[in-house]
Amino acid sequence: MEFELSFDPVEHNSNEFRSGQLGSLVDVYTPGNFPNLSEADVVVFSITENRGLNSDEKLKFEAIRNELYSLYQGENRIRIADLGTLKLGASPSDTYQLLADVLQECNDRGLFALFVGGSQDCTVGQYKSFVQSNQFCNMVAIDSRFDLGLDQQNLNANSYLSHIINLQPNVLFNYSNLAYQSYLVSRNEIEFLNKLFFDVHRLGSLRSNLEEVEPVLRDANFISLDLSAVKMSECPAVVDGSPNGLTSDEVCQLMRYSALGNKLQSFAIYNFNGDNDINNQSAKLIAQMIWCFFEGFFHKLRAVTANDENLVKYHVSMRDGEYNTCFFKNKQNDKWWMEIPILSDENQKFAPHFFVPC
């Protein structure tokens, strides 16, 4: 596909930034100048699709870009291309489809995609990129709610998850929620997700030991982050925020954990509402979140294989030898994985998910 036809350019002048600032290093799609994607590791872009929130408000992301590109690169440089703003479809469904096509093309080219939106129903576009490639996937949502919606509710930012679960063909291998708040979800929703053997992590339990969810993020194929998961006092530019939620440093730590996984293909930050921002506080936070992701991305772990010389292999026998499994420990960073034996040819399609981070 022609990337240039899927995006609108943005204004950017690299000469306005100091040496070492991201703005002097990133390759941005400006009028008449599309980035050379063969020289990029990561592509970033914005999505103005907002109809899933029943809003026609024109979203603007200049503040986020200005704050991000004013930050200095970390110890290691990541090659970044800014594709500008994804074009709006005639309907939200058209936008989802265009997003799915773009993300599938990014994956085919070996490019990681990070973008800021827009309403969270665009998560459907992230998921559809895996449906189109017939690839089973693990989804992680960092969100104060589950967004299951009501029975037969139209697809929007508050009901997108039920539509993903019901979408055919179904390639959702696992779903995990991080940072839900108990008073914002019903017991029926929790029981429903438990029946599907999905993983949900309450804000309080997550906060007591943030590192425990690192394996969950390391196992994700795509991640959808709702800014309402962050405390409204620390991120005021949100839709339907809460006085409770993740702190700025906690969400930045989750961003870094997310970047370490070798399966991850896209990361999206949703439900940004710049009109609610105060002194660019939210724009600054989002910029620093993305910076933390870039730092983690440089240390991205390579795919795990049973013959990897950097791994120590531990054989474990269970039920008096009835079952055997293996644990793998990376010698360099002490990360662990568990290998689930593939017992039949039918399960070969799930092979990428049989090394489980732990």
Feature roles, as predicted:
Residues 2-269, 273-358:
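Conserved alpha-helical scaffold segments that buttress catalytic/binding sites
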